[in-house]
Amino acid sequence: MMNNKKSIVLFYIVTALFWYSLYAYVPIFPTYVESKGISYSMVGIILGSYGFAQMILRIPIGILSDKFNRRKLYVTLGMLAAVSSNIGLWYFDEASLILLFRAFAGVAASMWVVYAVLFSSYFKQADAPKAMGFLLSVTTLGQVSATFTGGIVSGSFSDKHTFLLAAAAGIIGFFLSLMIKKEQKDITKEPVRLKDLLSVGKDRMLMLVSGLAILSQFLTFATTYGFTPVAASKLGASSYELGLLVTISALPGVISGALSGSFFGKRFGERNVITVGFMMTAASVLLIPFINSLTILFLTQIAGGFSKGMVFPLLMGMGIKNIPNDKRATAMGFYQAIYGLGMFLGPVVVGILTDAVSLGTGFVITAAIGFLAAVTAFLSLEKAKSACLDAA
């Protein structure tokens, strides 16, 4: 039996491989699907299926894992779903099957909530938040290393090889997941019930920040994980440059995310930081149709990545701040399921607009949604905060 320290290190490795297997092909995936002669509307639906699967499965998977207390099983199933997705994407070229196996990646990502609960069971309650911080850092490391190396592999071999790279990581992760430690027997968790979800859903602040999170994810999955790589390829970006583009879009968010609550929020106020973050993101998207240089596109995406990183952690924190401790896990499940709608709608809407009008129009409308989110945040967050304080 492994000691606890080795168990934790093993879990970190499994987590990194899990996200690596889901992200290795992401930079080239939009252009890969486009190269199959598939319409932009269908490209958007394929890209959005990842978020759609998470939107409908996250809460049921959380409920089932709580009910049967078999969380290690769901970690292993998540790896299998990721491997199945990657192999299917490598083997099949038909649009319907690409859609199916991309949705399988969303099924795999839906298991993430179980990863977090299982990992937290390795620690005393007081140490769990710090441990989760490390786990989220490992998650980011897995994603960023995947997008960077995926671009290199695609440029050196072919787009198809990125699916094999992702599958290899998933297979290694699957076998390692068989060795991770089960949850502590003395730790129990009350299963989430539908009435609990409906109860926390009535919280005004949680509903507001969940709506803003939908818009935040809309922006991210319409652009960075959606059609920005398509715009870059039209400017002559190589596969390596597409990988680099997605990587440098994510890295600044790691820095701004770490500073969002500890520095920016305290110094300038949460509402102001969220408002400015949405405005900066919208501006970076609005510029895309008018850019004729890859260098300028890279710079705008660095700025956009930094601004997105400021927004999301603050929204998450504000959503559960006034929720009672015994309902915070339920509130987080509600929040995560809700923002999956933005992951789905972002690429779908831009794909439809691109077919109907142009890719540039898709970016302009996406930017408009970002500015709308900024106005909504500025006008509504303080009112909702005051209402919560009055009700307390």
Show the residue positions of the predicted features.
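Cytoplasmic helix-loop-helix junction between adjacent transmembrane helices
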Residues: 101-138, 318
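C-terminal membrane-cytosol helix-exit motif in multi-pass small-molecule transporters
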Residues: 167-186, 373-381
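Helix-loop boundary and gating motifs at the non-cytosolic
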Residues: 4-51, 207-208, 218-232
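Structural signature of the two symmetry-related core transmembrane helices
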Residues: 73-87, 272-286
